[in-house]
Amino acid sequence: METKVQVECGGRTITIETGKMAKQASGAVVVSSGDTRVLVTAVATKTAKEGQDFFPLTVNYQEKAYAGGKIPGGFFKREARPSDNETLTCRLIDRPIRPLFPDNFLNDTQIMATVISADKDNDPGILSMVGASAALMVSDIPFQGPIAGVKVGRIDGRFVANPGFEEMEKSDIEIVVAASKDAIIMVEGSAAEVSEEDMLEAIFFGHAAIQGLLAAQVELAEKAGVAKREVLPPVVNEALKAKVKELAYSRMKEAVRIKSKVERHNTIDTITGEVLTALAEEFEGAAKEIKGFLGDFEYDLVREHIIKDGERIDGRDTKTIRQITTEVGLLPRAHGSALFTRGETQALVVATLGTSIDEQRIDSLFGESKKRFLLHYNFPPFSVGETSFRLAPGRREIGHGMLAERALARVVPKHESFPYTIRIVSDILESNGSSSMASVCGGSMSMMDAGIPIKAPVAGIAMGLIKEGDDFAILSDILGDEDHLGDMDFKVAGTSTGVTALQMDIKIGGVTREIMGVALKQAHEGRLHILSKMAETIGTSKAELSTFAPRITTIYVKTDKIRDVIGSGGKNIRGITEATGVTIDIDDTGKINIASTDKAACDMAIKMIRDLTAEAEEGKLYMGLVKKVMEFGAFVEIFPGTDGLVHISELDTERVKNVTDVLKEGDKVLVKCIGIDKQGKIKLSRKEALGASLPE
């Protein structure tokens, strides 16, 4: 049966319908706004795989080329591997729904969001977030929703829900908020150095904006009338649990307080191995259960110690930042480099400057665009003492890189004043929590080391949460284990003035305004501390670019001279680049950027362009080259491609019988421009230039 609900959100009508498409899926909806349509399906297997001990949730998001009236490029002419934007949207859909499945539901579950129509004003990613929740709500899959997502902007001081793409260009805040009826579940986005108080207002403005979407999903689920599957609670072997506790609890209590990550993990591994050996005969085949009980003990012990005693795994209190060491300029040939170390997390971050040729071309549903600021985050397995087979960057690396990129993009100079392409690469060398925020700190320092005139230094910090009943503790600069055992990972980046990026994920049902307010305030204090540590090494951008970075010189020519610079089939511009080795970029306005690490080569290229575009001026002297001799005079080239006529009467003060008596082809001759007619023909005189010389 086809069922449909409609709701207003941010002045836009959003429609959710089910029962028309993909009816064999466990749940399927089409979410639409304007001309944008997204089909979202949810399917879960009937039973879990034998021995399954984690929840296998997969989320896929794909933008069909036909949705924008396009045919895919490439040889095969079909959609291929996901773009970075599609990967990031997968993460946006995944993160808010993942905490809302029952703990003992371990069936393979797949969410597929397919963009089947797209306009340029309604974000299909936001509709997909709503659709994922709605598809689960109308299915028999157990799900503790609904949730909904909304994009929040602030334009001219006014918060706006789901602004269009053009509107967002005027906004100083761009965040995505996902929430349930009573609590925030996920936040992600960027801002132009906005205060923590304003960010909090934006988040809860978004929470208020989605209430109608939540109610609409409940109504849709009631109309669909599909009963949820029953999820039985896990059967606990109490005898085994008691035995494991007897053998390991006191030792685990000591182990979780070992400050070194490697030593702590090794000790826990040793305890695990000894318990497995001791119980192997009595409880044969129970290794997985035993490891589960030990993990539960570790979880409870760490959290209890933090809540009751205010002391964390490594001995810090809740607000202390780990020791920070920094260094810049450590790679001699790189344009800018920084080594940022915070505790057992270390990032080598390198900044490289390029030209417009190095810009990333992005082909999307809405046309082609160019990207001139890039940040690539790499997380090699050795950073955590592991081995793995590495291919392309995974979803996590792409997501962490984009978070760091957003944090730094707000302080990068505008292209008009700094016409460079900038690429930041962050290689994580060690990791024990907060590696993406180490990338932000190192990226800021590497740009300053490269001489890029950033608006202000940026630092980032990861905040955690331990919540037991009504008691909670906010943790500054969390460890990897605190992320794993805690309830929240809240990353905040910004300058001393305000926030430039944030990202929050939780593992519980949601967080309140009070918790978020405390976390943002504590993050601000931590960020200022980190910025002060960074400033001890470098606090402002170097006055000069690296000697190995290209220098870009900008000149302007008249628009009708652009073709003269390019030449037939690109002959002229190709000749300049081959002769000088420079890189040249010309736009339609006549703006020309010339890039080279060699100043002399750049100067030569400028002269060649000036010669190609120069115009003769009456009364001015020129050193010309005789190109052709005729009976009535000689044609003399005064600029490349620009000739003028020296009439026989203008060759000398005396009467000249034959032109060849004075000039021959290939001669260099000093001439003076004595006129330009209406057709642009240039009249030259050798006679007027006799006795004169070119100014130096």
From Swiss-Prot:
A Pfam family matched in the record: PNPase
S1 motif domain boundaries: 619-687
Boundaries of every KH domain copy: 550-609
Gene Ontology MF terms in the entry: 3'-5'-RNA exonuclease activity; magnesium ion binding; polyribonucleotide nucleotidyltransferase activity; RNA binding
Keyword line: Cytoplasm, Magnesium, Metal-binding, Nucleotidyltransferase, RNA-binding, Transferase
Subcellular location: Cytoplasm
Enzyme class: transferase
The enzyme's E.C. designation: 2.7.7.8
SUPFAM superfamilies recorded: Eukaryotic type KH-domain (KH-domain type I), Nucleic acid-binding proteins, Polynucleotide phosphorylase/guanosine pentaphosphate synthase (PNPase/GPSI), domain 3, Ribonuclease PH domain 2-like, Ribosomal protein S5 domain 2-like
InterPro entries (alphabetical): ExoRNase_PH_dom1 (IPR001247), ExoRNase_PH_dom2 (IPR015847), ExoRNase_PH_dom2_sf (IPR036345), KH_dom (IPR004087), KH_dom_type_1 (IPR004088), KH_dom_type_1_sf (IPR036612), NA-bd_OB-fold (IPR012340), PNPase (IPR012162)
Cofactor(s) needed for function: Mg(2+)
Entry binding sites for Mg(2+): 483, 489
The reaction(s) this protein catalyses: RNA(n+1) + phosphate = RNA(n) + a ribonucleoside 5'-diphosphate
Function: Involved in mRNA degradation. Catalyzes the phosphorolysis of single-stranded polyribonucleotides processively in the 3'- to 5'-direction.
Annotated family: Belongs to the polyribonucleotide nucleotidyltransferase family.
Annotated protein name in UniProt: Polyribonucleotide nucleotidyltransferase
Species annotation: Geotalea daltonii (strain DSM 22248 / JCM 15807 / FRC-32)
Gene that this sequence comes from: pnp
